[in-house]
Amino acid sequence: MKKSKWILLTGLVINSFFAQSQSVDKIKFFAEEGIIEMTLTTDIPKMQKEKGEEVFQPATASLKFPDNTVIAEPITVAPRGHFRREYCDVPPILIAFKSATSPRLSPLGKLKLVIGCGSRGNDEQVLIKEYLIYKMYNLLDEKSFRVRLLKVNFVDTRNKVKPYSQYAFLIEDDKDMAARNNCIRKPGAKYQTESTDRDQMTKVGVFEYMISNGDWSVPANHNTKLIFDKNNESALPFVVPYDFDHSGFVNASYATPNELLGTESVTERVYRGFPREEDELQVIMDFYRSKKEAITSLINNCTYLLPKIKKEAIDYLNDFYKTISDKKVVRRIFKDNARTK
């Protein structure tokens, strides 16, 4: 009897050890919804001053998951981006989780951490709205970047900066996003907008119009990624949009309109896609109408947005839905007055 109890106890201890030492599943990491609390410890002033690309420095990340599991391991971080690096209190960060000393976090690889421009209330609301745009596009297409919301506690190793906390989110790696859709990435590949998958590009163009984002370009690979069907070499690439902080839906204080559009505010919508035929427009507008309830519910159910901001966001989208309810207006915007080059 004592031997049986000892075997049972030993088994429980072993099972507990393996449970505690399991690596993070990178697919589940982005598929699950609960917020993660992360404490990021590094030399913050050094990171703020760094001007180079992918210049990594030592850091420690402690991640507390919704089930109260905690993983704390050494990582490295680097400032990234251009505009927000100059404008914001803390630049966007590239986190390298993979290393020999971080076996549990290593499967996450390198991920972009998107941070608000500051820890003030409005900055965080702006951050949450951009996060919601990614979630909105997830509702429309599997060929989209998944994101995971975090509450990040920043700790400076030299105590030059007082500890502070703010919302942030991690963006799925582009190669992982492609693989999830049976596709591959071809870094450096450049295509003209109309040389990509037409149906996908139609969906992307209307989405960018819906959120009023003029800060993208397919030929320049600016805020879009191309993914290629790995089982069909002759298939045209799919366009996947990202980086929406200059959109009218977000309406960040630092966002300015694309000069090419001739608008006075980022909230003024301009369709940047190419003309579509009326039968194509009927199909895509029906598709967007079918997603209205899910998109509205997503915003209404977001507990991190203030009621006033929720209302503004929904009103802004309702204006889009009002526009696409009129066939004549749709034809004028998405066909007659659309760009041709």
Predicted features, each with a name:
Residues S21-K341:
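Phosphate/dinucleotide-binding and metal-coordinating scaffold of catalytic cores
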Residues M1-S23:
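Bacterial Sec-dependent N-terminal signal peptides
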